[in-house]
Amino acid sequence: ITPLIDKIAEFIIAFHQSKVLDNVMKDSYSIVSNLPYNISTPILFHLFEYLDIIQDMHFMLQKEVVDRMIAAPSSPEYGRLSVMLQYYFAMEHLVHVPKESFDPEPKVESSFVRLIPYEHYPFVANNIEQFGRIVKEAFSQRRKTIRNTLKSFISENDFQKIGINPQL
């Protein structure tokens, strides 16, 4: 059954990447889904392209993914997923769904979450692609100092100008 699940996951990603929806979706939509847990993150990132037609989204996801989505800065769960989703969406953890709620019982806990695209972003990223690259790089090597991780984007002098300790 695993090869079948992999094929379904590939189809979902290929469908999302095909831009088929571009000509069909003209209004504002609510999306409700039990996303396949193994491909939920790429799907969430892909949905950034459709913010202008998304009213809100409700997803059943693996609990650990929801924990990362809504994580606060400085928490162990806080990372790229947190930063990017919190830039685009107000999020609300609606309910925890214990694994005992399913038959057969899965190995993981689930959570139901609501995402509402911001009308006005919490801050302005002048170049969203560059912002995404910086966030990705910043969380790719957590054990390195921020100076070493982001040296291709920001000089040590610039860190000092904006009041960030480059030794963090």
Labelled PLM ranges:
Residues 1-129, 133, 160:
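Catalytic cores of RNA-modifying enzymes
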